[in-house]
Regions:
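Short, flexible segments with low predicted structural confidence
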Residues: 2-3, 35-36, 52
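Active-site-flanking beta-strand signature of metal-NTP-handling nucleotidyl enzymes
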Residues: 3-10
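Short, surface-exposed ligand-recognition loops at beta-strand->loop->(often short) alpha-helix junctions
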Residues: 10-22
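An amphipathic, aromatic/His-enriched active-site/gating alpha helix that lines ligand/cofactor pockets
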Residues: 24-39, 57-92
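Short, solvent-exposed loop/turn elements at beta->coil junctions and helix N-caps
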Residues: 41-44
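Short acidic/glycine-enriched loop/turn segments that link adjacent beta-strands
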Residues: 46-50
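Short, low-order "capping/linker" segments at domain edges
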Residues: 92-100
C-alpha cells in the first residue's frame, strides 16, 4: 500500500531566497535520492496554518521506515531547519488529490 508523508513548516522571515534555493537544489533532489517521490506542495496565503505543506509518496511502509531512520533524512531535515520553523510531518495512506 502506497503511503504519503505530509510535511509542513513556516519559512523564517528574511530567509526566503536562501530557503527556495535550498529546497530546489538540495531538499527535493535529496528526498528523491532516498526514494520519496514528491507529489504536491501548497503555500498558505491566509489563515493560521503552516505556510508550506508538501507531500511525497513511497510504495510501502518498509521503504518509508528505512528512509525516516536514515542518517540522510536526519541530515536533510536538520539542514531544512536553518530556513524554517515548526517543521513536522505525518504519514498517511496515499490517495489522489489534496490531503491533510
Amino acid at each position: 500500500m502506497a503511503l504519503k508523508i505530509l510535511m509542513s513548516w513556516d519559512i523564517l522571515p528574511g530567509r526566503e531566497q536562501e530557503y527556495f534555493e535550498f529546497v530546489v537544489r538540495e531538499f527535493i533532489p535529496g528526498i528523491q535520492r532516498m526514494g520519496l517521490e514528491p507529489t504536491d506542495a501548497w503555500f498558505t496565503m491566509y489563515g493560521n496554518h503552516p505556510q508550506i505543506i508538501a507531500g511525497a509518496e513511497v510504495p510501502n511502509k518498509q521503504t518509508l521506515d528505512t528512509i525516516l531512520q536514515s542518517s540522510e533524512w536526519l541530515a536533510l531535515t536538520e539542514r531544512l531547519l536553518n530556513f524554517v520553523t515548526d517543521f513536522s510531518y505525518k504519514v498517511i495512506t496515499a490517495r489522489k488529490g489534496f490531503q491533510m
